[in-house]
Amino acid sequence: MLNINSLKPEALHLPLGTSEFLGCQRRHTLPASEFRCLTPEDATSAFEIEREAFISVSGTCPLYLDEIRHFLTLCPELSLGWFEEGCLVAFIIGSLWDKERLTQESLTLHRPGGRTAHLHVLAVHRTFRQQGKGSVLLWRYLHHLGSQPAVRRAVLMCEDALVPFYEKFGFQAVGPCAITVGSLTFTELQCSLRCHAFLRRNSGC
């Protein structure tokens, strides 16, 4: 009778090139381009993109890794990621807010009863910038928010130089934001999702 304890594990030897073929085959089974809500498992990839995009410019990040995990656990439906062959290349993370204007608390809180989606961060991987991906993702995200009956508007804060970019999507400046980060100051912008639906119908997107 064969004693299984005497069996020794042996390495599996594949023909030359087989492993490369299998890896390629696995990649080819992934969708070339996919949009989906993020999960806590996507947090590390999102933070790496965000850190590279923001630290070099402003010295800080809108969200740090534990905060990303926090929001993707509480409200993953308020996020959207763009994946190319399974790799995250751009994303937006949001949460619900229940006051008219943003406050320091809004940076870390999710208010389930709120009607306002607070966009914490939009970031694009460095190799995919200057290709219009941020614009496409933001259109899709606003459309995604519009499909959620509880969400009536979107709000964000940005530096003055980015205000014209967001105005193209129906956002309107409502004045200086009460939030400051170090020496950085921001403009607060709001967008009615009803207004966005009109713009989208007339944009050809």
Curated annotation (Swiss-Prot):
Top-level lineage group: Eukaryota
* Pathway connected to this protein: Aromatic compound metabolism; melatonin biosynthesis; melatonin from serotonin: step 1/2
Q: What is its main location?
A: cytoplasm
Reactions catalysed according to its record: a 2-arylethylamine + acetyl-CoA = an N-acetyl-2-arylethylamine + CoA + H(+)
Enzyme type, top EC level = transferase
- Which Gene3D superfamilies does its entry note? 3.40.630.30
| Compartment(s) of residence | Cytoplasm
Q: Where does acetyl-CoA bind?
A: L122, A123, V124, Q130, Q131, G132, K133, G134, S135, Y166, E167, K168
Intrachain disulfide bonds: none
Swiss-Prot/TrEMBL site (Important for the catalytic mechanism) positions: H118, H120
The modified positions for Phosphothreonine read T29
Instruction: Give the tissue specificity.
Output: Highly expressed in pineal gland at night. Expression in the retina has not been confirmed. Extrapineal expression could be strain-specific.
What does its record list under induction?
Exhibits night/day variations with a drastically increased expression at night in the pineal gland.
Domain N-acetyltransferase, residue spans: 33-194
Post-translational modification here is noted as: cAMP-dependent phosphorylation on both N-terminal Thr-29 and C-terminal Ser-203 regulates AANAT activity by promoting interaction with 14-3-3 proteins.
Give the miscellaneous note: Pineal melatonin synthesis is severely compromised in most inbred strains of mice. In C57BL/6, a polymorphism activates a cryptic splice site causing the production of an alternative form containing a premature stop codon. The predicted resulting protein would lack the putative catalytic and acetyl-CoA binding domains and therefore would be inactive.
Assembly behavior: Monomer. Interacts with several 14-3-3 proteins, including YWHAB, YWHAE, YWHAG and YWHAZ, preferentially when phosphorylated at Thr-29. Phosphorylation on Ser-203 also allows binding to YWHAZ, but with lower affinity. The interaction with YWHAZ considerably increases affinity for arylalkylamines and acetyl-CoA and protects the enzyme from dephosphorylation and proteasomal degradation. It may also prevent thiol-dependent inactivation.
- The molecule here is called Serotonin N-acetyltransferase
**Name of the encoding gene:** Aanat
